[in-house]
C-alpha cells in the first residue's frame, strides 16, 4: 500500500551534474523516510538528468520533471510545487545538501505548532570544508515564534538586508501555491529567484516558528555563489536581482487590504528593493576590477535612479561609496545657473568654521543668492545667522534617514549648489555629497586645515579623503601648498581661497597705528583655545622660561577658553609649577572690546601652533600694528611676503625667545615690523570675497587659485610629511593612555613609500631618507 509523503523536497537543477548526486544522497539519508524528492531539470545540457535517473531507478521516492526550455529556478520550483503531493515542502539546491534529520525535525515542529513556516539554521561550508562563521550566523533564525502580521514584519524588517533563501524554511505547500498564483505564470528570474516567493509567503503566512538546528548544508562558491564579475555582461546578469524584487510590487495591492498597517508592507518592499540594489553594487568592491566600475555604474543607472543607488549604498554597503565617488560622473561647478545655495556644518557655534560659514552666508546674500543653512545636529547658536538666510536643523535618526532628509531639503529648497564645511570633521559627508550629486546638485567641500593634518594625527583620513573627494565638484583648501598636496594625490578639482576676514579684523581694518618699541616691560599676547595638540600653549611657557633666562622684563597674557588638555585653571597651575607667575597671566576668554584692549596693550603676538590652515589671528594682531613672533608655518597665506613676522623652526623655544628679545631691543627694526604688519593685514582684507565666492559657484575662479604642483612644492610636502610623522609618533608614544603605535622608523618609512608613489620625481631624496632611517 502506498504511503503518502509527509514532506516534498523540491530540487530544481540546471547543469548540476557534479553535485546533484551528493544532494540526492543527503535526501536518502534522512532519518524520517516519509518524503518525496521532486527533481525539476531546467533544460540541463550536461548529464544532470542521467544522474537523477540512476537514483530514480534505485528509489521510487525520487521523481523527475523535465522542462524543455530553461526558465530559471523560479519556474523549476513552480513546477515542483504544483506537482508536490505533501502538505509541507522543503527546498534543496542542486549543489547543496541536507542534514540527516532535516525532514524529521522540521516536519515535527510544523505539526506540533500548526505553523505555516518553520525556520532553521544553516551550515555554511567553504571549498576547503571549513565553516564560514559570519555568514552562517547571519542565516540563523532570529525569532522563536511570530504570528499574524508580525511574521512578515519580523522576517523582512525595514532597513535590513532582505533574506530570501527558501532553503532556510519548511513551508505549507498550499501557501506556496497561493504565492505563485500572485505572480506572472511566464516570469523568468535568472537571479535571486527565491526572493519574490519568500517575500510573498512571509506576507501571507499567519504563523512562524523556528528551531536552532542547522538542517541545511550550504556550500559556498559551489555553483553560482560567490564568484567574481569578469565583464560588463556578467554584471548585467547580476543586475537581474533587481527584477526579482520589482516583480513583487504589482502583487502587493491584493495584500494591503488584509493588513493592520498596509504602509508597513510598502516600506518593507522598498527596503527589500534597496537591499537588492545594494546586493548588485556590492560587486563594485568585492568581486570586480575597478576598470569596470564606470561602465557598470552607467548600466546600473539605466535601470535604477541614481538617488536609489546612493541610498542603497548608504543603508547596506557603505564600503561602495568610494567607488561611487571615483567612478561616478562628477558634476562641475557652474554647469547650471546658481540661484539657491545651501551651506552646511555639524552645528553652528562661536568657532572658526561656523564663522567662515556665516561670513559666506552674508556675502552670498549680499550678492543676491538665496541662502539656506543646514545644521546636521542640534544646539546651534543662531545669533550670527544673517537676516534673509533660512536655517534648518536636521531631525532624522540614523544616516539613511538623514540622507533621505537631505534629498528632501535639496528638492524643497530648490538647491543649486552646496558648500559643505565638514569635510575634515566627518566621515559621513560623502553620503550627502553623493545624494546631492544624484539629484544633479554639486557639492563644494572645504578643508579647514593643512593637508598633512592626518599624518600628524596618525590616522587614515588622507586615504579616506583621497578615495571620496571625487564626490565633490570642487575641493577648497586654504593655501597653494594644499592645492599641490591634493593634486599630487590625484584630486585635480582643487583650489584654494583665503578665509573671509573675521569681525575683529574688519573692525580693525584701516585703524592700525604703528607701534613703538617697548621702553619698559615687554608686553606679549596670545589668544586662541588652549588646544595643546594643535596650538601648543605649553610651548608659550617654554618661550617664557627662555625669556626669563635671558633676563628680559616681560609679561605674557594668555587669552582663551580651555580645551581638551588644558582648562584655564590647569594652564595657570602649570605656570605656577614652572615659577612663571610673575611673567605669565592666564586670563581665560576675552571678547570684543576687552580683547582689542589686550591686543593694543601688547608689543608682540606670540604663536606656537604646530599646524594651522589659515590662522586669522596673525592678521588680527597685525591690523592693530602688532608684529608676530611664531613657529614657522610657511604655507599659510597670511604669512606670504609678510615682513611683519619673525619665524623660527618648529619647537625651537630658545631661538624664538632670542628673536623676541632682539626685536624688542632694536627700535628701528621693531618700527619697520609694525609698519609691515599693518600693510600685511591690509592685504588680507583686500580680497573681494563676494566676487571670489561667486566665481567659485560658477566654476570660474582665476587660475592663480588652482596652481599646478611644482618640484619645490613636492620637496616641501616631503619635509613636512617627515616632520609630522615623527612628531605625531613621538607625542603619541608619550601618552600611555593611547595604544602603542608602530615603531617610528617603520611609520616614517611607510610615509616615505607613500610619498614616492605620489611624488615620483623625489624618489632619490626619499631613498636617502629611508637609508638614513
Q: What is the predicted role of each segment?
A:
Residues 340-344, 515-535, 541-544:
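Conserved donor-binding/catalytic core segment of Leloir-type glycosyltransferases
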Residues 67-84:
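Glycine-rich, basic loop-to-helix element that forms the pyrophosphate-binding segment
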Residues 645-653, 662-667:
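Conserved acidic donor-binding segment of nucleotide-sugar-dependent glycosyltransferases
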Residues 470-495, 501-505:
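A short, active-site helix/loop in glycosyltransferases that binds the activated sugar's phosphate group
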Residues 569-589:
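Nucleotide-activated donor-binding/catalytic signature segment of Leloir-type glycosyltransferases, i.e.
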Residues 373-379, 527, 555-570, 588:
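Glycosyltransferase donor-sugar binding loop
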Residues 94-211, 216-235:
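Donor-binding/catalytic cores of nucleotide-activated saccharide
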Amino acid at each position: 500500500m502506498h504511503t503518502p509523503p509527509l514532506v516534498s523536497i523540491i530540487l530544481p537543477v540546471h547543469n548540476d551534474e557534479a553535485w546533484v548526486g551528493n544532494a540526492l544522497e543527503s535526501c536518502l539519508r534522512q532519518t524520517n523516510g516519509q518524503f518525496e524528492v521532486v527533481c525539476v531539470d531546467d533544460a540541463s545540457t550536461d548529464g544532470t538528468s542521467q544522474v537523477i535517473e540512476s537514483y530514480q531507478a534505485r528509489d521510487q521516492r525520487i521523481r523527475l520533471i523535465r522542462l524543455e526550455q530553461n526558465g530559471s529556478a523560479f519556474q523549476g520550483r513552480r513546477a515542483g510545487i504544483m506537482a508536490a503531493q505533501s502538505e509541507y515542502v522543503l527546498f534543496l539546491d542542486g549543489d547543496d545538501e541536507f542534514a540527516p534529520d532535516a525532514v524529521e525535525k522540521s516536519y515535527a515542529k510544523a505539526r506540533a505548532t500548526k505553523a505555516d513556516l518553520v525556520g532553521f539554521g544553516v551550515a555554511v561550508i567553504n571549498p576547503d570544508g571549513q565553516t564560514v562563521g559570519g555568514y552562517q550566523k547571519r542565516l540563523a533564525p532570529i525569532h522563536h515564534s511570530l504570528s499574524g502580521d508580525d511574521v512578515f514584519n519580523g522576517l523582512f524588517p525595514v532597513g535590513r538586508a532582505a533574506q530570501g533563501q527558501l532553503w532556510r524554511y519548511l513551508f505549507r505547500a498550499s501557501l506556496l501555491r497561493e504565492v505563485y498564483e500572485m505572480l506572472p505564470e511566464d516570469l523568468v528570474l535568472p537571479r535571486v529567484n527565491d526572493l519574490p516567493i519568500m517575500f510573498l509567503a512571509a506576507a501571507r503566512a499567519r504563523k512562524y516558528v523556528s528551531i536552532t538546528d542547522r538542517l541545511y548544508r550550504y556550500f559556498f562558491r559551489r555553483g553560482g555563489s560567490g564568484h567574481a564579475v569578469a565583464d560588463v555582461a556578467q554584471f548585467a546578469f547580476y543586475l537581474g536581482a533587481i527584477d526579482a524584487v520589482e516583480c513583487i510590487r504589482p502583487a502587493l495591492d491584493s495584500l494591503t487590504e488584509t493588513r493592520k498597517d498596509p504602509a508597513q508592507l510598502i516600506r518593507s518592499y522598498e527596503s527589500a528593493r534597496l537591499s537588492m540594489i545594494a546586493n548588485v553594487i556590492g560587486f563594485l568592491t568585492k568581486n570586480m576590477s575597478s576598470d569596470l566600475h564606470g561602465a557598470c555604474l552607467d548600466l546600473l543607472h539605466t535601470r535604477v535612479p541614481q538617488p536609489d543607488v546612493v541610498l542603497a549604498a548608504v543603508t547596506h554597503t557603505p564600503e561602495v561609496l568610494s567607488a561611487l565617488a571615483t567612478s561616478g560622473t562628477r558634476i562641475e561647478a557652474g554647469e547650471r545657473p546658481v540661484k539657491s545655495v545651501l551651506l552646511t556644518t555639524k552645528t553652528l557655534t562661536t568657532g572658526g568654521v561656523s564663522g567662515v560659514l556665516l561670513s559666506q552666508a552674508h556675502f552670498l546674500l549680499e550678492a543676491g543668492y538665496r541662502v539656506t543653512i543646514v545644521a546636521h545636529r542640534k544646539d546651534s547658536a543662531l545669533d550670527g545667522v544673517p537676516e534673509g538666510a533660512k536655517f534648518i536643523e536636521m531631525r532624522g535618526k540614523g544616516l539613511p534617514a538623514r540622507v533621505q532628509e537631505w534629498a528632501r531639503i535639496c528638492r524643497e529648497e530648490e538647491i543649486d549648489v552646496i558648500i559643505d564645511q565638514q569635510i575634515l570633521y566627518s566621515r559621513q559627508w560623502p553620503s550627502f555629497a553623493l545624494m546631492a550629486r544624484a539629484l544633479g546638485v554639486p557639492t563644494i567641500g572645504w578643508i579647514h586645515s593643512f593637508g598633512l593634518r592626518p599624518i600628524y594625527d596618525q590616522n587614515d583620513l588622507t586615504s579616506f579623503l583621497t578615495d571620496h573627494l571625487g564626490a565633490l565638484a570642487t575641493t577648497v583648501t586654504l593655501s597653494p601648498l594644499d592645492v599641490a598636496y591634493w593634486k599630487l594625490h590625484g584630486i585635480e578639482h582643487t583650489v584654494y581661497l583665503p578665509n573671509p576676514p573675521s569681525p575683529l579684523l574688519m573692525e580693525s581694518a584701516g585703524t592700525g597705528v604703528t607701534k613703538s618699541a617697548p621702553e619698559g616691560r615687554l608686553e606679549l599676547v596670545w589668544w586662541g583655545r588652549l588646544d595643546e595638540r594643535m596650538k601648543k600653549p605649553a610651548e608659550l611657557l617654554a618661550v617664557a622660561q627662555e625669556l626669563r633666562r635671558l633676563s628680559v622684563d616681560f609679561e605674557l597674557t594668555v587669552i582663551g577658553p580651555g580645551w581638551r588638555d588644558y582648562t584655564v585653571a590647569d594652564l595657570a597651575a602649570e605656570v605656577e609649577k614652572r615659577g612663571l607667575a610673575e611673567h605669565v597671566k592666564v586670563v581665560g576668554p576675552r571678547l570684543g572690546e576687552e580683547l582689542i584692549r589686550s591686543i593694543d596693550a601688547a608689543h608682540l603676538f606670540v604663536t606656537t601652533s604646530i599646524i594651522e590652515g589659515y590662522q586669522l589671528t596673525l592678521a588680527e594682531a597685525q591690523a592693530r600694528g602688532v608684529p608676530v613672533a611664531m613657529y614657522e608655518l610657511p604655507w599659510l597665506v597670511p604669512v606670504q611676503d609678510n615682513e611683519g613676522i619673525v619665524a623660527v623652526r618648529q619647537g625651537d623655544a630658545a631661538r624664538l625667545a632670542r628673536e623676541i628679545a632682539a626685536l624688542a631691543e632694536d627700535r628701528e627694526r621693531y618700527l619697520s615690523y609694525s609698519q609691515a604688519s599693518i600693510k600685511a593685514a591690509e592685504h588680507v582684507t583686500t580680497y573681494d570675497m563676494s566676487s571670489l565666492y561667486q566665481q567659485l559657484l560658477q566654476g570660474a575662479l582665476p587660475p592663480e587659485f588652482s596652481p599646478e604642483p611644482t618640484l619645490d612644492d613636492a620637496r616641501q610636502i616631503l619635509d613636512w610629511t617627515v616632520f609630522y610623522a615623527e612628531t605625531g609618533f613621538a607625542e603619541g608614544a608619550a601618552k600611555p593612555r593611547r595604544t602603542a603605535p608602530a615603531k617610528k622608523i617603520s611609520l616614517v618609512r611607510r610615509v616615505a613609500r607613500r610619498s614616492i608613489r605620489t611624488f615620483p620625481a623625489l624618489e632619490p631624496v626619499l631613498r636617502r631618507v629611508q637609508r638614513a632611517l
